[in-house]
């Protein structure tokens, strides 16, 4: 992202369109870094655990590496980390969000290693394979976009709603032969 922003600055780009449509997400810390590159100040995202106890808040630290106008494209398949970026851009008034309401995945999961006993062998990895590992993924928190807004189950609502046209592929050979 930083390399692209440096190039945009050298080329005197007048605006940026960030396309997060069909982006299922990614790593929490990477979403925070992308948002930080565009936003001057404020809480970019925060995490809360059970009972609403705040676990972590990520603040803008880079003073917004770029100041050019920003539009973020989203759709119903934009989820998780992409919603962190879109929510920060929208709720901190850094740019406009265009498209459909996003997926609404505001939950944070952690993967815990499990060592299960092997039947008849005491303790150790399952099936006696020392390389085999098991894990348990648990939801441990949810993240909130700026303004302490939960997107879990509701998504990020765009500033400008645009319903995509569903274009069907036409068989031009058949169409021509029918004429």
Residue ranges and their predicted role:
Residues 125, 138-139:
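Conserved catalytic cores of soluble enzyme domains
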Residues 49-51, 128-131, 145:
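Acidic surface patches and DE-rich sequence motifs
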Residues 135, 142-179:
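Conserved functional hotspot residues or short segments at active or partner-binding sites
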Residues 1-121, 142:
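Cleft-lining beta-strand/loop regions that shape enzyme active-site pockets
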Residues 62-64, 111-114, 126-129, 147, ...:
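Short, surface-exposed patches at the edges or C-terminal ends of soluble domains, predominantly
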Residues 109-131, 162-179:
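Intrinsically disordered, low-complexity segments enriched in small/polar residues
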């Amino acid at each position: 992202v930083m390399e692209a922003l440096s190039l945009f600055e050298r080329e005197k780009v007048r605006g940026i369109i960030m396309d997060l449509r069909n982006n299922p997400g990614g790593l929490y810390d990477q979403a925070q870094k992308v948002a930080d590159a565009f936003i001057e100040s404020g809480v970019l995202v925060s995490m809360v655990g059970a009972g609403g106890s705040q676990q972590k808040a990520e603040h803008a630290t880079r003073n917004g590496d770029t100041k050019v106008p920003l539009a973020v494209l989203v759709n119903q398949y934009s989820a998780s980390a992409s919603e962190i970026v879109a929510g920060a851009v929208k709720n901190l008034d850094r740019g406009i969000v265009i498209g459909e309401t996003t997926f609404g995945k505001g939950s944070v999961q952690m993967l815990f290693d499990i060592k299960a006993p092997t039947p008849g062998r005491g303790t150790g990895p399952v099936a006696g394979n020392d390389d085999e590992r098991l894990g348990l993924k648990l939801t441990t928190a949810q993240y909130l976009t700026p303004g302490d807004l939960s997107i879990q189950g509701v998504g990020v609502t765009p500033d400008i709603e645009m319903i995509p046209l569903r274009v069907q592929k036409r068989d031009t050979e058949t169409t021509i032969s029918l004429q």
